[in-house]
Amino acid sequence: MSGQLISRITDMIKSEEWNATSLEDASAKVSNVMVKALMAGIAYDSRKHAYLFRALVEMLKGEARPLTEGEYEMLGKTIAEHINVELKMMRDVEELIKVIGDERLKYVLRYILDDEKRHHALLLGLQEAVNRRELVTEFEWLNIVWKDVPFFF
């Protein structure tokens, strides 16, 4: 089963990379800044998805490496800092939504806010995993990190 799963995920990596390249090429030909930004954002997400799929393949093959103590220390500091940044961004975007009347602008702001909320939930899950410093299997990492992310499970 894992061989078939790895093959399927590998195909998904190729699709995400093709999608990213296609969107990047198209956005380079567009003059409207908002359209360009939205297309670039989707292309970036496709590259991110391909990267995450590669990590899944590594995990399925049993090739993932455990974190070192130095990595735990660095991650603890970095994650704590970024949790605060995400909280500030969520508050700032929520304030903008309240004062902006144009629904098109609000749509973009809500899109950004949704991303910030997902980032915040992921960072909290990562922080929990880093703080535990227990021997955690790769699939336990997935559960710890993703359990509070809306719409994931």
Where are these regions (language model features)?
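Non-heme di-metal
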Residues: 1-153
